[in-house]
Amino acid sequence: MLIYGRNPVLEALRDNQVTRLFVADGIDSKFTKELEAAAFESGVELEWYARIELDRAVKTTNHQGVIAEIPETDFAEIDDALELAAARGEELFLVLLDGITDPHNFGAIIRSAEVLGAHGVVIEERRSAPLSPVVVKTAAGATAHLPVVQVKNLPRLIDELKEDGVWVYGAAGEATAKLEQLDYNRPLALVIGSEGDGLRRLVREKCDELVSIPTKGKVQSLNASVAAAILIHTVISSRERKKK
């Protein structure tokens, strides 16, 4: 698979995932030095091409002058998220995506989840954008550090999580429960629905609680990735306060 963009490529190099590295002639020297250092550590040589050749390879000009070839991305397992939570000594926190089909939203949610401290992002096989180069670029390297899990049946996973003591909160604009009213200091899965349709009825019914983000403006709703970032930050902030 080809990935592109400076942050995703650097993270892939640092994670020893890159098999070939394609660089555009004339990119700035500061980034070239950083790229050369990371490539040297990873044992990969830089291959120089005219920028138009890179444009053709990924069918976009938005590659920032660097493309990397990596093995096809394998999805993680739920156990990988459990292990990450255990390694940090934290209660499990998963972000479940129900129908996020826009790759930019998907990538942005992965990025927010990794940066803010969630332990994994879970998607359903037939109701999600694929883990594509656009997603990887938008995630800005976060896919190298955060388990991204794909399941066949999200409602079934929710049942299994609940059986294991995980609480499931769903984001819903019409929910009466507000952010500050819920307990986040427990094993938790947060479900984010699509911008157009929200959560499916079956997913909604399986949630222990539905939560909304208070708004004051005239626009009805937030972008899915923005809403996810706010909710993820709320969970992590609540847990940090609990530690003090």
Where are these regions (language model features)?
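Surface-exposed amphipathic alpha-helices with a cationic face
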Residues: 40, 158-162, 236
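Structured adenosyl-cofactor binding patch, chiefly the S-adenosyl-L-methionine
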Residues: 10, 137-142, 201-244
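RNA substrate-binding interface of SAM-dependent RNA methyltransferases
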Residues: 11, 17, 83-177
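Short beta->alpha connector loops at strand-helix junctions that form conserved
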Residues: 24, 50, 71, 98, ...
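Short, glycine/polar-rich helix-capping loops at beta-to-alpha or helix-loop-helix junctions
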Residues: 31, 128-134, 197-206
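N-terminal positively charged helical leader segments and presequences
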Residues: 1-84
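Active-site/ligand-binding-proximal alpha/beta "capping" segment
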Residues: 169-224
